[in-house]
Every structure is written in structure tokens, then in C-alpha cells.
Amino acid sequence: MIFMVIKKIFGENFNFNKNIDIKKIFKLDKNVKKDREENESYLDALKEIYEEIKNLEIYEKMTIGMAEIIIGYDNVEKTKKYIVIEPILTKEEIKLFLKLRKVVQALLDVPVEEIDKEKLEDYLKEKIKEIFDDLKLTLDDVTRHKLIYFLIKYLIGYGKIDALMKDENLEDISCTGVGKPVYVFHRKYEHLKTNIKFETDEELDSFCISLAQRCGKSLTLANPIVDGSLPDGSRLNVTLGRDISDMVQHLQ
């Protein structure tokens, strides 16, 4: 189980380790397939978005980064919703993203000083572009922008809930377990159900551990509850009810 009270957060800061052989780590076909109509995962994602918004009476729409936010009332479920619509990655783009993430992670070193998040984000974007050029990847502009967006989101952002973290109108973000929707408390619309879920125990545990580490604390069997402060002073409360020692080992 996880419950979070978060207002405004910034990512951890890193320097690049230049003694890494990028090409040795990164082995893949340089040509990324572009035929999205034949990509089942892409079409499934489109259908999922349609199902989320087809019954909505829309209150408000806005954009956060590359994410479109739709707030409205679902006339079938009889509940208010906060829908996050992000760029869709095809199967080939997902494979490319996962390999690129490994490369960038290999280039990241231990944090040495506090850096403004905006400067860090710009710094990472430039480094990622350099990696693209070094590997001579054949990518269109749309694919490049999407990959950069997701790399930033998962490397220094907050993964699945990154867009929620960046919405200044949200006061609380909470989740009560695997397969259950994340809920938010909005200053104007109050309690809203999102379309974001953590699909597996491993995914949720990994996320909890990451948040705890940003508070300078650890989640263990002996210490399954963390109540702490994130770097900007926001409060975090996390409770886990399963063995996470394997997840700690995985993250290390």
C-alpha cells in the first residue's frame, strides 16, 4: 500500500561519467519502424484513451510538457476524473527507449552538488541528443522528442505520475495498491480519479523505494513504513506490506 502527500518535487542531480563506451552498451538496429497502423500496442493504447474520455463531460483541458490533461465528469461511472494523455510509444520505440535508458543510466554518476532542476533537465536533453548523434540513429523529429520526453520523465522525474507532480493545482496524490487507480486532490475540483495505475507489485514497490530514497530513508521488512520529507519540504507517507528486499537489491 502507498499513500503520498506531495505538492512540488524536483529530481535528483547527476554528473555524467565520461568513461563509458556507449556503443558497446548500445547494440540495436539503427532503423526504427514507423508503421504505427500495424502496431498492435499502439492501436490498443489509442483504444484505451478513447474508452477513458468517451463518456466525459469535460470541465477543463490543459497541457503539461507533452502530456495533455483532461478533467471532467464520467457520466457512466458517476465520478470526476483526471485523465493524463501522453505520447504513445510503438513496440519498436519502447525497445529503443529501454536501451537508451540503460545507456544514459550508465553515464550517470553519483550526485555531487545541488543543481536547479530546469538546468539539469536542459543538460540531460543535450547529452541525450549527443548520444543520438553518436549512435547515428535514424529517427524522425516526433520520435526523437518522444524518446527525450520519456527519458527525462523516468530518469529524473517521477515516472508514471510525473505529470501529476508538475500540476501545481494538485495537493495530494495517493494510491492504495496494485491495479488500483491513483487519486488526486485538486484545489478546484477536489477528489479526482486518474487513469494511472501500477500494474504489478514489483512496479509499485520499486516506485515506493525510489520515493523513500529521495527522503533519505530506506524501506525494509524491519521498517515497512516511511514518513518523511521530500527535498522541497513536501510530506511523504509510504506503507508496504510485502517483502521488498529483492527490490532493494534490484535497484542497487
Curated annotation (Swiss-Prot):
SUPFAM superfamilies found in the cross-reference section: P-loop containing nucleoside triphosphate hydrolases (SSF52540)
Top-level taxon of origin: Archaea
Family note: Belongs to the GSP E family.
InterPro entries associated with the record: P-loop_NTPase, T4SS_GSP_E_ATPase
GO MF annotations, alphabetized: ATP hydrolysis activity
UniProt protein name: Uncharacterized protein MJ1288
Organism annotation: Methanocaldococcus jannaschii (strain ATCC 43067 / DSM 2661 / JAL-1 / JCM 10045 / NBRC 100440) (Methanococcus jannaschii)
